[in-house]
């Protein structure tokens, strides 16, 4: 395996960066941070009491776009609970919350230079696919026939 990694240039870079990577010491992260150390109770309206109504046109559109069969009661219940959860999240007040870019605020992330190391390897990549058509991957269809 090591011989295989040493042949490819991008694998050499990956193994070198792993050797140079420093360990994260979580005990060092005791500094003041924007992330609260204990959960904060958020007050937002409970929307679980309101019944979600979904018409058949919307269900058919979702089935066609997502290739998921929503005929069963269990699938509809899951869809309705997902909508209620999204509605709860939409009502959370985030007026005075600054955006968080990384949880490790005071620790630098090691990034490598973005360099193209290998190119024009379409044939090698397409060898990994089970089914191809005109130099494209063919993905298996979902549980709904595409003839609709």
From Swiss-Prot:
Its EC number is 6.3.5.-. It catalyses: L-glutamyl-tRNA(Gln) + L-glutamine + ATP + H2O = L-glutaminyl-tRNA(Gln) + L-glutamate + ADP + phosphate + H(+). Its main location: mitochondrion. It is found in: Mitochondrion. Keywords: ATP-binding, Ligase, Mitochondrion, Nucleotide-binding, Protein biosynthesis. PANTHER family: GLUTAMYL-TRNA(GLN) AMIDOTRANSFERASE SUBUNIT C, MITOCHONDRIAL. Allows the formation of correctly charged Gln-tRNA(Gln) through the transamidation of misacylated Glu-tRNA(Gln) in the mitochondria. The reaction takes place in the presence of glutamine and ATP through an activated gamma-phospho-Glu-tRNA(Gln). This is Glutamyl-tRNA(Gln) amidotransferase subunit C, mitochondrial.
